[in-house]
Each structure stands twice: as C-alpha cells, then as structure tokens.
C-alpha cells in the first residue's frame, strides 16, 4: 500500500497552554560535600529545552507545519531563553507576559545517568486575566486548521471552556491533552487524548477492551465530545467516535527506550494532520506511527517527516544507520532544519565493549543526533599495525549502527577524520581519552564554525588491546 504523508506545509496549528522551560545540568560526581551529606556535582554541560505546551508546538513545527504558541510567562531570562529556542525551530511565539510571576522552569541536576534532584521555579497562573489569551485565539482562528489546548494544570487554561467555545463558533477543531479528573471542563471539545491511566482515573479500572469502549462512549456522550483517543502504551491506541466502529491500533514501537513526551508527539501529529485536511482516522494512523518512533529515543523528542514516512512504510531503518558521506550530509542538513543538535565522534571500534557503549551513550545525550565516523580497514592497519583490525569495516559499522545511541555511521580512509569533519561541521565534536581539545582532529574547523569540542572519559579497565591480550593469553593457557 502506498502511503502519502499529509501536506504538513499547508497546515496551521495554534497551541495554547502551560509553557515551561526544562533545564538540565550535567556533570561528574566524585565527592561528598563537607557542608551536608550530599554529592558535589561539577557541572560541565548545561542544556535548555522547551517543555509542556512548548514541546507540543515543537512537534508540530518539526513536521514542517506552521506552529503558533500562546501561553503565560514571566518577564525573565527563562522567558527569553524559551522564546529563542522556539524561534530557532520555527515556532511562532505570542506569549502573554505576567510581571508578577516567573516563567515555569524545571531544573534537573544529573550525574552518571542519574537525576539527583529537580528544582521547580513556578507560581500557578490561576487568577491571571485570560482575556489576552482569548484575543490571541480569536485573531488566529481564521488562519488555522486546528487548536490544541495543552493542559498541565498550571493556570493557562483556567478559562478552557471559553476557549473551546471560541473555536467551535469558528468551526475549528479543538484537541485537548487533559489533566486531572474533571473532564467537565473540557465539554464540547472535538477530541480528548488521555492515556489509559488518565482515562481510568475518570471512568474506573477497565479489565477488557470492551470496557474501554463502553465507558469511553459514555464519556463522549456525557461531555458532548466528538471523539476520544485513549493511548494505551504497549497496547497501542483506541479511537472512539459516536456511530462508528471503534478503531484499535496496535503499537508500532520496535523498542521502548523512553516514553517522555510521547503524548506531546501524539497530539502534535494529530493536530497537524487534521489541519492539513486529512480525516481523524488518518490522523490517528500517523500519530500512532510517530509514537512508535519517539518512544525509541532518549528524552523528550520530536519526529521528522522522514522518520514518519519511514515508519508508516515499514522502513524505520531507512535514513539511519550506515551511510555514505553524501547521504550523511543530506541527513545532517535535514536535522539542522529541524533545529537538532548534531554530535560527532570517531574511532576504530574494533572489538566493541562496555566502555565503547557507555561512551557512545554519554555522547548521544549531549545532542539530538550522533554520528560515528569509523576508520577503514587500511586506516586501522596503519594506526594499529598489521594484526588489526580484528573485525572488518562492514561488520564494525553494522554493530555500531545497531546501537540505540547511534544515529549515523560513516567511514573514512585517512589516518584522521579531519576532512570528513570539515565537510560535516557538527555542532559538537566529541573524543574519548586523554586528549586536549586542540589536539583533536577537526577541532579547528568546528571551532571556526561556532561549534564546540569536548573530551569524554572512557570507562576504566575497558580496552580493545586488553581484550585481545586476554584472548591470546587464554589460547596459550
């Protein structure tokens, strides 16, 4: 069956809801504070990502649709950082600034892949005059094909019923990702998208699919909804509409790595697809495919048109894995258009061991995409001697490409990947070992382009050389 993606470029979607900024501080921990029994984290990496309703808008923009975002912020650095991050990925922001409140910010401190603490900077926006939000919605209704209301119970949607009525009068579908158990406030919405836990918190525990349908249809009638989509994790999702046969879609996820933000992806793809002129059933089909992609990524993520197309055509591996240099350049260009941060590293990776896997996982966390450049067999032989490599290039690249942390694998013939790096110009160049940043091949080119260069430590006790020596000793023994 030939599947054609929706014409996302002609879709206009407004997202209104609770916007927030997610901050991440990363660093090693090697001692306990003398002031209190707590670890000391030496912060070496800081990341800022749009969260809440802002992540929904990013998901819409990543598809190539026209995304507008309305929400409440303070007048502070967090609001400015949020606006800049969203502008970089083509989300049009029209925030209402509230000088008496801070922008909702969640700061997470992480070390050795563990979150040590989360600090929330927020004051609920309940009681803030909703009229400026209503005015922004009214101004946009003639130019959008869908309105998303993203509720995190922080106060931006205190007047959600008025917002629903504004859109209904204009004939614009309203999609809501609900929060809490008071679904009365969402009366008259086009579509609610609760997950199974949220759904059962309202209707009670459902032991069978039939119970989900029965109670879901009653919910639709009670609150005058047009449809209900219950997302059910590994069991897929169920679309319920009055007078129509329930549509149960199995999950398309090959491997679940992280469900963070999956709900944002689902409602974002639903809205963009509906706004492009497709049916609700088609929108659910694409949203289900997108969810299968995004849960295979670490952290809050978005889905690109290429990834979505590959997923719906059953070719989730196309566009990723082992690539030629020219294919890689095209993939990187597409990633940059989506506002993704590209990380690059290189090495021989002859006998893949735990140290390699840990190193690559840590490198991947520093960005959105990870490129691994691999020395060819001839290059490896010149660097390591006639007995190397143990594993030929093709096998080394296939194994690397199968790792969850690795997006793209490419080879190079030279002793160093300097020429390759100069052609790719990653946002962040990473190398493991005892190098100084200025000693790393390609560092000058990356710096000249405004990028960063970082040295990561390898896991102690892990090396290909030691593994080979042990094998040789075991043979002699």
Swiss-Prot record:
Residues 1-318 are annotated as: Ribokinase. Residues 344-477 are annotated as: Cytidylyltransferase. Pathway: Nucleotide-sugar biosynthesis; ADP-L-glycero-beta-D-manno-heptose biosynthesis; ADP-L-glycero-beta-D-manno-heptose from D-glycero-beta-D-manno-heptose 7-phosphate: step 1/4; Nucleotide-sugar biosynthesis; ADP-L-glycero-beta-D-manno-heptose biosynthesis; ADP-L-glycero-beta-D-manno-heptose from D-glycero-beta-D-manno-heptose 7-phosphate: step 3/4. InterPro entries: Bifunc_HldE, Carboh/pur_kinase_PfkB_CS, Cyt_trans-like, PfkB_dom, RfaE_dom_I, RfaE_dom_II, Ribokinase-like, Rossmann-like_a/b/a_fold. Pfam families: CTP_transf_like, PfkB. The modification N6-acetyllysine is found at residue 179. The active site is at residue 264. Its EC number is 2.7.1.167, 2.7.7.70. In the N-terminal section; belongs to the carbohydrate kinase PfkB family. In the C-terminal section; belongs to the cytidylyltransferase family. NCBIfam families: cyt_tran_rel (TIGR00125), PRK11316.1 (NF008454), rfaE_dom_I (TIGR02198), rfaE_dom_II (TIGR02199). Homodimer. This is Bifunctional protein HldE. It comes from Escherichia coli O17:K52:H18 (strain UMN026 / ExPEC). The lineage of its organism: Bacteria, Pseudomonadati, Pseudomonadota, Gammaproteobacteria, Enterobacterales.
């Amino acid at each position: 069956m030939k599947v054609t993606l929706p014409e996302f470029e002609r879709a206009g979607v407004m997202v209104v809801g609770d916007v927030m900024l997610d901050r991440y501080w990363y660093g090693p921990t090697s001692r306990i504070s003398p002031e209190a029994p707590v670890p000391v984290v030496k912060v070496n990496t800081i990341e800022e990502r749009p969260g809440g309703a802002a992540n929904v808008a990013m998901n819409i923009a990543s598809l190539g649709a026209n995304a507008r975002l309305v929400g409440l912020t303070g007048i502070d650095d967090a609001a400015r950082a949020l606006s800049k991050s969203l502008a970089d990925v083509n989300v049009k922001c029209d925030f209402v600034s509230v000088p008496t409140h801070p922008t909702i910010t969640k700061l997470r401190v992480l070390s050795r892949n563990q979150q040590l603490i989360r600090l929330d900077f927020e004051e609920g926006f309940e009681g803030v005059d909703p009229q400026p939000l209503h005015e922004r919605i009214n101004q946009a209704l003639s130019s959008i094909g869908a309105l998303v209301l993203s509720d995190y119970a922080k106060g931006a949607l205190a007047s959600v019923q008025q917002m629903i009525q504004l859109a209904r009068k204009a004939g614009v579908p309203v999609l809501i990702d609900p929060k809490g158990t008071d679904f009365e406030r969402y009366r008259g919405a086009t579509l609610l998208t609760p997950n199974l836990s949220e759904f059962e918190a309202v209707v009670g525990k459902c032991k069978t699919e039939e119970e989900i349908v029965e109670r879901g249809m009653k919910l639709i009638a009670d609150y005058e909804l047009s449809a209900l989509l219950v997302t059910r994790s590994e069991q897929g999702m169920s679309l319920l509409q009055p007078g129509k046969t329930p549509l149960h879609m199995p999950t398309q996820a090959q491997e679940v790595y992280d469900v963070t933000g999956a709900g944002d992806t689902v409602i974002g793809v639903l809205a963009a697809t509906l706004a492009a002129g497709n049916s609700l059933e088609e929108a659910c089909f694409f949203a289900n495919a997108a969810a299968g992609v995004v849960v295979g990524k670490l952290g809050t993520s978005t889905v690109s048109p290429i990834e979505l197309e590959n997923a719906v055509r059953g070719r989730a591996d196309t566009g990723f894995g082992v690539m030629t240099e020219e294919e890689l350049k095209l993939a990187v260009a597409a990633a940059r258009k989506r506002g993704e941060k590209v990380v690059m590293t290189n090495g021989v990776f002859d006998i893949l061991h735990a140290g390699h896997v840990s190193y690559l996982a840590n490198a991947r966390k520093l960005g959105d995409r990870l490129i691994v450049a691999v020395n060819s067999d001839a290059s490896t032989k010149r660097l390591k001697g006639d007995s190397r490599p143990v594993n030929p290039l093709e096998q080394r690249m296939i194994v690397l490409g199968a790792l969850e942390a690795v997006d793209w694998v490419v080879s190079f013939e030279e002793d160093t990947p300097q020429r390759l790096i100069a052609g790719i110009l990653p946002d962040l160049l990473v190398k493991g070992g005892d190098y100084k940043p200025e000693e790393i091949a390609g560092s000058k080119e990356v710096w000249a382009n405004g990028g960063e260069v970082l040295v990561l430590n390898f896991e102690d006790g892990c090396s290909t050389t030691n593994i080979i020596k042990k094998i040789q000793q075991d043979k002699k023994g």
